[in-house]
A protein has these predicted regions:
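Short, structured helix-loop element that forms part of the nucleotide-activated donor/catalytic region
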Residues: 249, 255-278
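Conserved donor-binding/catalytic core segment of Leloir-type glycosyltransferases
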Residues: 218-234, 240-244, 259-260
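Short His-centered aromatic/hydrophobic patch
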Residues: 108-113, 132
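Carbohydrate-associated surface elements
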Residues: 174, 196
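Membrane-proximal helix-turn-helix segments that form the acceptor-binding/catalytic region
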Residues: 149-168
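Active-site proximal beta-strand in glycosyltransferases
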Residues: 5-6, 121-141, 169
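N-terminal subdomain of nucleotide-sugar transferases
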Residues: 1-69
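A short helix/loop element that forms part of the nucleotide-sugar donor recognition site in Leloir-type
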Residues: 203-217
Length: 278
């Protein structure tokens, strides 16, 4: 299998540490997918906005997979929420870089990247494949208490991307159904590609006892762990409340119970960490 794919992930970089800021599961998904395609002979360039002045314009992260930086906007201080202000400039720079090279398909991730990719796909006649990952209309239908709704600019942007894309990748049947019912996507353009699991990483290894010894946990501890960016809709507060209820019903569990919350604040939402502590 041969070919070249231009993957676009504007709001976060494969070079960032997942679990901090806006870097999360999407970073891992995009990088791992690119490496699997590269193993089949497809060259993948991942385009992202520069957020580190000390990193080269092009960084090879594995054989056949490179990160290419879009030099648009300030290096520091631009949150994901402010990125829509830069869509026009990002589109121009991405189109320029694309016109100087040759790619068979563009694969954009998240609505901002889809909007950035649309002009290049149209001008250069390259198929645009898009993965939403999350959708504003779905999130707004399932808001946590006190959570701010997604803005209309995102709803409109997602609708435009769905209409412009040659193909749409959904992770689940439910996501595919939402694309059709909430965004009027053509069912023939929606393809469900379920994410896989890297069993070389997610394995029992030397066993539970050895793992507990490494991280300093008692062998008889009852361990509950949350792993992910700390955002209301990911449910860390639900874990804390459930743990509290469990202790009320079974107070004898308290001495052995250990609750781990592993992850950092997401984007500008740093107050959530302090709120959970309280």
């Amino acid at each position: 299998m041969n070919g070249r794919i231009a993957t676009l992930m504007v709001h976060t970089s494969p070079l960032d540490q997942p679990g901090i800021g806006d870097a999360g599961g999407m970073n891992i998904y995009v990088t791992e997918s690119a490496e699997r395609m590269a193993a089949m002979g497809v060259q993948v360039d991942i385009f992202t906005r520069r957020t580190n002045k000390d990193v080269a314009d092009i960084v090879e992260i594995s054989p056949g997979v490179r990160v290419r930086h879009l030099n648009v906007g300030p290096v520091d201080g631009v949150t994901k929420e402010r990125l829509p202000e830069l869509i026009g400039e990002l589109s121009k720079e991405f189109t320029r870089m694309m016109s100087e090279d040759s790619y068979d398909v563009i694969h954009s991730h998240y609505w901002i990247s889809g909007k950035v990719a649309m002009p290049a796909a149209e001008k250069l006649g390259i198929p645009l494949v898009h993965t939403m990952h999350t959708m504003a209309r779905v999130k707004n239908l399932n808001l946590a208490e006190g959570e701010v709704p997604e803005p209309m600019i995102r709803v409109q942007g997602e609708t435009q991307v769905v209409a412009a894309a040659t193909g749409l990748i959904a992770n689940t049947d439910a996501e595919a159904a939402s694309l059709v019912s909430l965004y009027s996507a053509c069912p023939d353009n929606v393809h469900v590609v379920s994410p896989g699991v890297d069993l070389y990483t997610f394995t029992a290894g030397a066993g539970r006892a050895a793992a507990r010894e490494v991280v300093g946990l008692a062998q008889d501890a009852l361990v509950i762990t949350f792993v992910g960016r700390i955002q209301p809709h990911k449910g860390p507060e639900l874990l804390i409340r459930a743990t509290s209820e469990m202790i009320k019903h079974s107070p004898q569990l308290r001495p052995k119970l250990v609750v781990n919350i592993i992850g950092g604040a997401s984007g500008a939402n740093t107050s959530e960490v302090e709120r959970l502590k309280e």
